[in-house]
Amino acid sequence: MVSSPATQLSVLATDGRLQFLYPHQNVRLDTLTLQKTDTMKRLVSLFLLAPLAISTLTLSANGQKAYKIALSNSFYGNTWRKQMVDVMQKAADGAKAQGLISDFVVDNGDGTANTQLAQLNSLILSHPDAILINAASPTALNGAIAQAAQQGIKVVIFDSLTTSTDAYQIAYDNSSWGEIAANYVVKRLGSKGGNVLITRGVVGSQPELLIYGAIMKILKSHPENHILGEVDTEADNAKAQSAVANLLPSMPKMDAVLSEGSYGVVQAFLAAGKPVPLVIGNNRAEFILWWIDEKAKNGYQTISLGSEPSIGVVAFWLSIHILQGDKVPEMKAQPYLLPLVAVDNDTVEQFKDIKPGTVIAHQYDDQWVKDNILNKQ
């Protein structure tokens, strides 16, 4: 795997505390501002070009082609994915105003590979210049991706990756996410262990498979911990609350729950009148705000880990640079990795102003991509 430059992965220190500070400087968050930065001023002249009978290309004001970009998003059923589409649309609107793109098409799926494959085949027939894919399956889309590449369409896969080598791929180190979460639980439960419930995310997606696999590997290597079961949540708080609430009457005491739908898990325990166990967070606003309050009242301790919906913006700007012929890092044989965002008891108050209904995420833009990816090869 290719790691992004100047990054530091979340790790557990010998005392069990999570040591993490997001390494990139001069970046803002989608949901709050931690550090003020100067926004690059862009002066763009826009002209209306009369259609040319001899050409079907859409040209920008400087005579360069304005690209058509398409997004194939496998799933739209949780806060993370909705925020992802929103910030990508905002980036596309800005690029269109600059004359860099002529259109941005979004296809949202139902979480199944079959639906996404059908949508992807339809997109290929429309022949956009680039297709951005958040994949439902690591393998099911490979044939369509190869077909797109053969037709000269640039393909950038992000967040949920595939095994294709025909596309540029960028994601997070999700195996480390699972390892960090599980190791923290093992450390907190101690030598006597305890009862653990697994709450899974978007089952079948590549990130979820990596997170789940890493969690299970760690827990099974510590047999003092008993896995009570697992439930699917689609990384959605409401689904997590319902699934956990259905289990609670028949389950023995739970000591830890990891790692999706964290606020829904909390609500299930509270509604049942049971004490909230150790719950690993997933960087959703509702859990972060509950944690801050519960820490102040009762000293609640945990960690929260997550990828960022704004990775879609990174993929968007990368696709434009690829189309413009700019040199980008190797991303086909091995994915390019961004660092996870991790929060612990020492840093959670930094996010007290997070907007409800959002996920902690940096606000990436074209300049960030230039400074931190293109110019650091």
Question: Model-predicted segments: where are they?
Answer:
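Short, low-complexity disordered leader/linker segments with a strong preference
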Residues: 1-68, 125, 146-151, 371-377
